[in-house]
C-alpha cells in the first residue's frame, strides 16, 4: 500500500473547519490503496477549545504523529500554529519520511504557512508535494489599508506564495477557482497535475451522537427554529443585511409567524459588525440569537437535524464553495441558500433537487430587485406546506470517498509526470 503524508498543523480534537478536509480525506484513503500518515502539532499547543468527542470521527487506521510548537504568549503574540510550530513540523515530517518512506506529501490550506513547511520538507527529502487550496491565499482582504494587519497579510501572501509553490507537483482545491490564480501568477506551473474535489461528507458522521444533546433553542418555548452554523464572512454581510430587511418588512406586514426564531452559531468575532448588530439595526433582535463561539461539529449536525430549516449563506464571490452545504442538505431539513449565481454550490443544489428556495446573487441585478427575490423565496421557505424532498443519492459524487479517490488519481498522475 502506498503512503500519503498529510502535513496539517491542527488535528482532531481541534474543532476547526480545515481539520475536516484532512480528516475526511484520510478516513477514505485506505479504500483506494493509500495509507494516511498525519503530522500535526500536539493539541497542548492549540489556542482554540478542544472537542474530545471528535475522536469518534477518525478511523482507526489513520496514523498520527505529533510535534511540539512554541506557545503563544505576550512575548510571542503569533496565533498561527504553522508559524509557531514551523521548525518542529519540518523536523517531525523529515523523521517520519526517514522511517516510513511515504510516496507523496499533501497539505490542505489554510494555514497557508504550512505550504512553506511542505516546500522545506521537499527540499530536505526530495519527496514530491501537493498543496490544496480551500481558500485563495492571495486575495483582496476586506478593509486592507496601509499599515493595518490586512494590508500586511496580502503583501506577505504575494511574497511567500511563489516560494511555497515553486516546486509543487500538484495543486488541488475545493474548486478550480481556488488554485488557478496560483498558476496564473506562476506560469512555470502550467502543465502540472491539478484538480478539484469538494470537501464532501462522511455519511457515518450523521449516525454519531454528540455528548451534549442540548439544542440552541431549549428553554425558548414553542418556537420555529431556523439555524445558521458557521463563520460570518465579510462578503456575507450584504446577504444578511438584505435578508433581515426582508424579515423586518414581513413582520411589520403581519406575514411572519410569531414563533419564528433565527439562531446563528459559530459566527466568530471579526472586525466588522456581528449578526446581532444587523438584527438591532432592523428591529428584529428579539427573534435573532447569535452565539459567536463554535460548538462541536457533532453538536452542529444534531442541531441542524432538529431544526425547522437551515440558512446556507455564501458570499458574493463566485469562487466561494461553502463546504457546509452538504451538512445542511443531509440534515433532513429544508435549506434556504444564498450564493453567487456562478458558485459551484448552485449546481450541487440543482442536481440534488435542493434548490426549491435558492437565491442566486447576480451583480448585474439592481438591489431592489434582488431584495424582492429574497422576499419571495424566504416566504416560500418558511411556509411548512411547501414541499422539500431532495434527492440525496445525487450527492454521492460529492462524498469524501469520491474526493479521496480523485485525489489518489491526481497524486498518481503527478508521480507519473515526475518519473517521466
Where are these regions (language model features)?
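N-terminal subdomain of nucleotide-sugar transferases
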Residues: 1-68, 404, 412, 416-420
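Conserved donor-binding/catalytic core segment of Leloir-type glycosyltransferases
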Residues: 5, 217-237, 244-245, 403
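Acceptor-binding helix/loop patch of EC 2.4 sugar-transfer enzymes
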Residues: 9, 70-77, 99-100, 125-162
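Membrane-proximal helix-turn-helix segments that form the acceptor-binding/catalytic region
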Residues: 113-116, 120-124, 151-171
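Acidic donor-binding loop of glycosyltransferase active sites
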Residues: 169, 302-319
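Carbohydrate-associated surface elements
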Residues: 177, 200
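Nucleotide-activated donor-binding/catalytic signature segment of Leloir-type glycosyltransferases, i.e.
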Residues: 259, 263-268, 272-299
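A charged, aromatic-enriched C-terminal amphipathic alpha-helix characteristic of glycosyltransferases
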Residues: 361-375, 379-413
Amino acid at each position: 500500500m502506498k503512503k500519503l503524508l498529510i502535513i496539517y498543523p491542527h488535528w482532531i480534537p481541534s474543532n476547526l473547519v480545515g481539520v475536516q478536509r484532512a480528516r475526511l480525506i484520510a478516513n477514505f484513503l485506505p479504500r483506494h490503496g493509500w495509507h494516511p500518515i498525519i503530522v500535526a502539532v500536539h493539541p497542548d499547543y492549540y489556542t482554540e477549545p478542544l472537542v474530545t468527542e471528535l475522536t469518534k470521527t477518525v478511523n482507526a487506521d489513520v496514523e498520527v504523529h505529533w510535534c511540539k510548537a512554541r506557545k503563544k504568549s505576550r512575548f510571542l503574540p503569533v496565533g498561527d500554529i504553522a508559524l509557531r510550530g514551523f521548525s518542529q513540523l519540518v523536523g517531525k515530517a523529515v523523521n517520519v519520511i526517514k522511517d516510513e518512506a511515504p510516496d507523496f506529501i499533501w497539505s490542505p490550506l489554510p494555514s497557508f504557512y504550512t505550504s512553506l513547511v511542505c516546500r522545506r520538507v521537499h527540499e530536505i527529502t526530495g519527496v514530491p508535494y501537493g498543496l490544496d487550496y480551500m481558500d485563495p491565499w492571495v486575495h483582496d482582504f476586506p478593509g486592507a489599508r496601509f499599515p493595518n494587519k490586512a494590508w500586511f497579510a496580502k503583501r506577505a501572501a504575494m511574497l511567500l506564495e511563489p516560494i511555497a509553490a515553486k516546486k509543487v507537483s500538484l495543486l488541488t482545491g475545493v474548486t478550480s477557482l481556488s488554485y488557478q490564480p496560483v498558476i496564473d501568477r506562476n506560469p512555470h506551473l502550467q502543465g502540472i497535475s491539478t484538480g478539484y474535489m469538494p470537501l464532501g461528507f462522511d455519511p457515518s458522521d450523521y449516525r454519531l451522537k454528540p455528548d451534549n444533546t442540548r439544542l440552541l433553542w431549549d428553554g425558548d418555548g414553542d418556537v420555529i427554529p431556523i439555524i445558521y452554523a458557521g463563520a460570518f464572512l465579510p462578503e456575507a454581510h450584504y446577504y444578511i443585511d438584505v435578508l433581515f430587511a426582508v424579515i423586518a418588512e414581513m413582520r411589520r406586514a403581519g406575514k411572519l409567524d410569531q414563533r419564528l426564531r433565527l439562531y446563528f452559531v459559530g459566527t466568530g468575532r471579526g472586525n466588522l459588525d456581528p449578526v446581532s448588530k444587523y438584527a438591532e439595526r432592523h428591529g428584529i433582535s428579539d427573534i435573532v440569537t447569535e452565539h459567536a463561539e463554535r460548538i462541536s461539529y457533532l453538536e452542529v449536525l444534531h442541531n441542524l437535524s432538529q431544526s425547522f430549516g437551515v440558512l446556507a449563506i455564501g458570499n458574493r464571490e463566485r469562487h466561494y464553495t461553502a463546504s457546509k452545504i452538504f451538512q445542511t442538505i443531509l440534515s433532513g431539513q429544508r435549506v434556504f441558500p444564498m450564493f453567487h449565481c456562478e458558485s459551484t454550490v448552485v449546481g450541487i443544489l440543482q442536481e440534488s433537487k435542493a434548490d426549491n428556495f435558492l437565491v442566486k446573487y447576480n451583480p448585474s441585478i439592481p438591489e431592489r430587485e434582488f431584495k424582492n427575490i429574497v422576499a419571495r423565496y424566504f416566504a416560500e421557505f418558511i411556509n411548512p406546506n411547501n414541499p422539500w424532498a431532495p434527492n440525496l443519492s445525487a450527492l454521492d459524487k460529492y462524498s469524501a470517498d469520491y474526493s479521496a479517490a480523485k485525489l489518489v488519481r491526481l497524486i498518481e498522475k503527478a508521480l507519473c509526470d515526475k518519473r517521466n
